[in-house]
Amino acid sequence: MHEAPRGFLEGEALRPRPFRAGLGHLGWIFAGGALGAAARLAVEGAARRLAPAAYEAFPWGTLAANAAGSFLIAIFGTLIFERFVGERARAFWVLGFLGSLTTFSSYALHTLRGWEASPLLGGLYGGGSLLLGLLAALAGLRLTRRLL
């Protein structure tokens, strides 16, 4: 079993290697970004189709995309920080795909709009998104370490 360092950046395992992106990496970032944006659109569409009334009352699609992105970023973050992952994979998956799939700006907007409609609803969404994102990231981290 992998033992995580005690401090946030204590130990070599959690110190990110510098990303040496160059112009050659832009294509990988663009390609990952296009797929991440398409995945985001698919998640939003699925949320709307599965529960149209609930979708109008609560931003389920953003919540689902951010939770999935938190899970996946923990997997790729663990691979990047604890094992070697090439610069192209890092550019494609982390900067491109996950950067397009998850959006903090949408989270902030939905939280504020929910708060304006109902402080309880806005608080539940804002707090729930944060908690779900952290739990998803923890699950991704633990799963990846278990598999490594």
Curated annotation (Swiss-Prot):
InterPro entries: FluC (IPR003691)
Transmembrane annotation, as ranges: 23-43, 61-81, 92-112, 120-140
GO CC, one annotated term: plasma membrane
Disulphide linkage map: none
Superkingdom of origin: Bacteria
GO terms for biological process, alphabetical: cellular detoxification of fluoride
Topological type in the membrane: Multi-pass membrane protein
GO molecular function, one term: metal ion binding
Activity regulation comment: Na(+) is not transported, but it plays an essential structural role and its presence is essential for fluoride channel function.
Keyword field contains Phosphoprotein: no
Subcellular location: Cell membrane
Catalytic activity field: fluoride(in) = fluoride(out)
Residues annotated to bind Na(+): G99, T102
Keywords associated with the record: Cell membrane, Ion channel, Ion transport, Membrane, Metal-binding, Sodium, Transmembrane, Transmembrane helix, Transport
Role noted for this protein: Fluoride-specific ion channel. Important for reducing fluoride concentration in the cell, thus reducing its toxicity.
Family: Belongs to the fluoride channel Fluc/FEX (TC 1.A.43) family.
Official protein name in the record: Fluoride-specific ion channel FluC 2
Organism: Rubrobacter xylanophilus (strain DSM 9941 / JCM 11954 / NBRC 16129 / PRD-1)
